[in-house]
Amino acid sequence: MKMRDTFLKPMHPEGRKFVGIFAAITVILFLIWSVLGWIGVGLTVWCYYFFRDPERVTPAREGLIVSPADGIVSMIEKSVPPAELGMPDQALTRISVFMSVFNCHVNRAPIAGRIAAIAYRPGKFFNASLDKASADNERNSLCIEMADGRQIAVVQIAGLVARRIVCFSSTGDTLRTGERFGLIRFGSRLDVYLPEGVEPMVDLGQTMIAGETVLADLQ
């Protein structure tokens, strides 16, 4: 029952064409050799699983910053937000969440607020778990401004396998905490830059659930 429930989660619309392509190839493989066909079935099921989009229960209390992605906390360090966002040139606490190809890759807003800026920058495709991925890899950055004027930066970073960053939101949009705003296909990383003076409430290696796990408390 538990395994069935895991694989029968709703699929994000971004995954439909990929599942369709895998399914079409599977039919062709069955015509060639049944063994190849069953391998295709397995890959099609995996593709469906990759693009799963389960509902999440986001904490209701205001001031809680939640994880924007499923995965593992790979880094916690001081760093300056991406220059293209136009935020102050000041080192802030950066929490990096690494997503493997087995994690759900739908990205969610870490806090409620208005998107003050979105900036895409092309780049390399180093392993997203490496520190240099923040500076060198393809990325899409968002600056979310909260009601009190403080800002949080969220950065979608492409990885070794991921070659497509998707962002559903636009500058000026208002997001709720835990609301879907994008995804990255096939392995990647999300960086969150906390406001000055806000301390992280997570540890290295800790498992994150997007929209649920609390990263920090503004209060």
UniProtKB/Swiss-Prot annotation:
Top-level EC class as recorded in UniProt: lyase
GO biological process, one term: phosphatidylethanolamine biosynthetic process
Enzyme Commission number(s) from the entry: 4.1.1.65
Residues at the catalytic site: S188
Record-annotated site: Cleavage (non-hydrolytic): G187, S188
Pathway in which the depicted protein is active: Phospholipid metabolism; phosphatidylethanolamine biosynthesis; phosphatidylethanolamine from CDP-diacylglycerol: step 2/2
Catalytic function, reaction form: a 1,2-diacyl-sn-glycero-3-phospho-L-serine + H(+) = a 1,2-diacyl-sn-glycero-3-phosphoethanolamine + CO2
Modified-residue entries (Pyruvic acid (Ser)), positions: S188
Any one cellular-component term (Gene Ontology): plasma membrane
Bilayer disposition of the protein: Peripheral membrane protein
Chain's role: Catalyzes the formation of phosphatidylethanolamine (PtdEtn) from phosphatidylserine (PtdSer).
Protein name: Phosphatidylserine decarboxylase proenzyme
Organism: Ruegeria pomeroyi (strain ATCC 700808 / DSM 15171 / DSS-3)
Taxonomic classification: Bacteria, Pseudomonadati, Pseudomonadota, Alphaproteobacteria, Rhodobacterales
